[in-house]
Amino acid sequence: MGHDIDQVAPLLREPANFQLRTNCDPHEDNFGLRAHGPLVRIVGESSTQLGRDFVWQAHGYEVVRRILGDHEHFTTRPQFTQSKSGAHVEAQFVGQISTYDPPEHTRLRKMLTPEFTVRRIRRMEPAIQSLIDDRLDLLEAEGPSADLQGLFADPVGAHALCELLGIPRDDQREFVRRIRRNADLSRGLKARAADSAAFNRYLDNLLARQRADPDDGLLGMIVRDHGDNVTDEELKGLCTALILGGVETVAGMIGFGVLALLDNPGQIELLFESPEKAERVVNELVRYLSPVQAPNPRLAIKDVVIDGQLIKAGDYVLCSILMANRDEALTPDPDVLDANRAAVSDVGFGHGIHYCVGAALARSMLRMAYQTLWRRFPGLRLAVPIEEVKYRSAFVDCPDQVPVTW
């Protein structure tokens, strides 16, 4: 990264299909932005929502990694601001760790990390495997054609997270339903606000029970070990962050992963070649698919020069994870799915202090899901052309349905 300021980046109109996909690949509009360099200025819906004349768009790997790892010059904490449309951007989501800076971020993250150690993940794997087996039993009973997304991909991540948090099993179905309704951006703000209020009431009751009698789930563990140092609002925020970051991400990675592997069948056999190769398949799918296309906007809190461009304090930067992971600066032939490529340090699960705390658990779940699916259904194939697969409007990219047959 140079420190000299080059000519100011051109101001570009935000494309209509900005941050959308064409099946498993970035929409071609994203490549149009890349032609102007790894860091550009755009004006459009994003700048209007953030109350700025323009925002920076970072899509080169080195630039994105630099920005995600720099909490000296950038913050993810939302600010009170009046946008041009009259809408307000909220100041802070209490407890949602992705919007915190040190030292508050450090305090909350330390509460979570014991639950995501390798030892803890190994202890969870039998329960996750049982859940995967049960969902595939239901898929098979529905067959020989069924919606893999609705019967398998969606429930696996959601119910595994419920078990992790300590959500009672009798509550899990309704809990998951509310998660999905609240994340559905196609529903109106009023409807989503009502769902959010009901969800918060449920969390209030759950936390009251955990305060009185903590169980062995993540919430119970935090209450037992840190009860005097964490508020209920922070606990609710941690729950929300884990739900938004975990449920849809795993669902999207299973659904998109199946689409990608069916389109690249030579990669499927690598899942069974060795544990190391299976791990590489999962890592390559995370790089190739990057279901969380754009993390929280970064707000510059100090002037900083990146890639020859002066980003001033008060400027917002949007980072494209998907485009960064499809950059030749990261790996040759980045638009090819190839688990045999040399290992890379992609940003599929983020980078820096906001690196996904549950990344190792997610990888373990994905490996088990892919392996068990193809062990049970070696003749799996799409029941429709991939162009007919529909995608949902949510915080994380995810197929709405994946019709399969076997």
UniProtKB/Swiss-Prot annotation:
The UniProt entry, under CDD domains, shows:
CYP105-like
Q: Per the entry, which co-factors are needed?
A: heme
Recorded GO MF terms: heme binding; iron ion binding; monooxygenase activity; oxidoreductase activity, acting on paired donors, with incorporation or reduction of molecular oxygen
Q: Which InterPro entries would you find in this protein's record?
A: Cyt_P450, Cyt_P450_B, Cyt_P450_CS, Cyt_P450_sf
**Which UniProt keywords are given for this protein, alphabetically ordered?**
Heme, Iron, Metal-binding, Monooxygenase, Oxidoreductase
Q: Which domain of life is it from?
A: Bacteria
Write down the Gene3D superfamilies for this protein, in alphabetical order. Answer: Cytochrome P450
Q: Tell me one GO biological process term.
A: vancomycin biosynthetic process
UniProt-listed PROSITE patterns: CYTOCHROME_P450
- The UniProt annotation places heme binding at C356
Asked if Secreted is a keyword of the record, the answer is no
EC assignment: the record states 1.14.-.-
Q: State the similarity comment.
A: Belongs to the cytochrome P450 family.
Task of the protein: Involved in the coupling of aromatic side chains of the heptapeptide of vancomycin.
The protein, known as: Cytochrome P450 165C4
Gene (UniProt): cyp165C4
